Amino acid sequence: MLRLFGAQSTAVGKTVENLPPQWRAAAQWKSRGAETLVALQAQSPSGLKKAAQALRQAFSADLYGAGETTLPAAVVEALERHDKLLICADAAAGALLEARLENLPGAEKVFDFGAVSYANPKTGPLIEKRARARLPKDCTDPLRQALARAQAARRVVGADLSAACAERENDRVLVLSCRKGCFLRTVPAGENPALWLLDIIRRTAANKPQAEGTGFLPARRAAKKDVLPSPQPKRHPLRRVCMTLLVLALLAALVAVGAWKYTNGNFYALPEQLRALLTEHVPRPGATLV
């Protein structure tokens, strides 16, 4: 049994269908939300091994475990293996992670459960103060606030990864700050934000590509107060046509200037001079081209 998160079920089905027939392997898969379980069967151990290896290679970033491995356990294992410390920048992110990581072996070594971050009586207010300093005074956008908190918490605590959550009316935006920048994902109300946040953490800790739909804000842009791109001004529909006509007019003007100089101001002599110029370069009978 292979466990995937963030893989497209259609891609899984296509990969299974393309398994070489000589392996004599078959697979059944079931998707629930963003998670997909794949059960492999084969008539020989070698065929089963090859089929499993093919799926592992095709979905190396989506694969988080096998057998009874859970996504939270895979996150703890990835943090431990790559020596990463994870914290939460706010209570919303803490509510998503703490209940799922508690009681897991080794979790307290890689996750603070709020002890030195947002829930700490000294560190928590300092994180909020640093976050407010990064924002305009009149900013009320929950996403900008979550981005600022995630970055401020990571720097205040000195952690490798800092998670935050922007709660909005119809969705939540998950934020994970790392040294390179911030990963962001919008999760609709019907999906499980905790699992998506765990998956983002797992992929970031293991330096694996994120699932489709997870965005990234580089550190230089994330460090600016105006972190989100402003709407692009609408261009007039005739702007491109006008620009094309202007370029053509400039080219015509350049041609006219060149013709004026070539004919010494006598445009009527231009056809005759062009005809003479072409005649000079036409090979005559018996001539040898060099």
Residue ranges and their predicted role:
Residues 262-282:
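Ser/Thr/Pro/Gly-rich low-complexity linker/stalk segments immediately outside membranes or between
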Residues 31-36:
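Short Gly/Ser/Thr- and Asp/Glu-enriched loop/turn motifs at secondary-structure junctions
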Residues 4-6, 38-44:
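Short beta-strand-to-loop capping motifs
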Residues 46-243, 248:
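Short alpha-helical segments enriched in small residues
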Residues 1:
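Conserved anion/nucleotide-ligand pocket segment
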Residues 280-290:
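Short extracytoplasmic
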Residues 252-261:
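Hydrophobic alpha-helical membrane-insertion segments, chiefly the h-region
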